Regions:
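Active-site entrance/lid segments in N-terminal catalytic domains of soluble metabolic enzymes
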Residues: 1-133, 145-148, 157
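Hydrophobic faces of well-ordered beta-strands that scaffold small-molecule active sites
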Residues: 20, 117-120, 140-141, 172-176, ...
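Extended hydrophobic/aromatic segments used for targeting, binding, or gating
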Residues: 132, 137-174
Length: 250
């Protein structure tokens, strides 16, 4: 629904956001086998299995019923999908996303935003170059946590080739598999501008709330600093390919 896209872009502009990101690797939902097996939906459906789970987790149930209902806040005035109607993530993606989205659609969003813009889900040199052509200022090298295309390449393995091909024309953000400070250092040494991570924030938030997230960030900060000292690097500019040793391929 282009009206939803236009509305979101306009709202971001009014709210003075600095940049925008378009995810391009979820045109259809991946085969989420665990979701199929568990019947996971939002909000949860009442089944014998879910009722038994609720009984075993009273704190979760109390938290669920004492807080606001789950809703897609960004689009709640445009659609009721994902609010009162129990839907699986797979169903929502397949109903709301357009599998026919093309480079033309991405370029439309770039021009309408008219500011720093990233494409998330770029995994090849050719697509990185195309992103430059349509006006993107950054890409997120990501395979969506390996949950979309089965057997997809590792994002880390694509960074060096993409950086060599695009030079300093794009910021390259490595997404996926980043769990430790050393992972960040390896990515930067390979040519990434920065790293991003999602599940780490969600796990920390679920386990410890805001303090959990702050603890995560402090751990990451300490690991990066500690390992830079151990590597003999005074600043991030000293992280380059000479700091990496790749396993030889047979």
């Amino acid at each position: 629904d282009n009206s939803i896209t236009d509305d979101l872009i306009d709202r971001c502009r009014v709210s003075k956001f600095d940049g925008m990101c378009l995810t391009v690797d979820t045109l259809v939902a991946g085969n989420r086998e665990k979701d199929h097996r568990t019947g996971f939906t939002t909000p949860p459906k009442l089944t014998l299995q879910s009722l038994m789970s609720f009984a075993a987790h009273p704190n979760w149930v109390f938290n669920y019923f004492t807080h606001g209902k789950f809703e897609m806040s960004n689009v709640k005035n445009k659609t009721d999908k994902g609010t009162n109607i129990a839907k699986s993530v797979i169903e929502y993606i397949n109903e709301q996303y357009d599998p026919a989205m093309s480079w033309k659609d991405a370029e439309y969003c770039v021009k309408k935003w008219n500011g720093p813009f990233a494409l998330k889900g770029v995994m090849s040199v050719e697509d990185a170059k195309r992103a430059i052509d349509i006006g993107c200022t950054a890409i997120m090298v990501s395979n969506h946590g390996g949950r979309q295309l089965d057997g997809s390449r590792s994002p880390f393995d694509q960074v060096a080739a993409i950086r060599e091909a695009v030079g300093d024309k794009l910021e390259i953000i490595l997404d996926g598999g980043v769990r430790r400070g050393t992972h960040v250092l390896k990515a930067l040494a390979a040519g990434a501008t920065a790293c991003s991570f999602g599940k780490m924030f969600l796990f920390s938030l679920a386990a410890g709330g805001q303090q959990g997230v702050e603890h995560l960030l402090q751990n990451m900060h300490d690991e990066i600093n500690r390992n830079m000292v151990l590597m003999g690097c005074k600043n991030l500019k000293e992280l380059n390919s000479s700091k990496l040793i790749y396993r030889k391929k047979n």
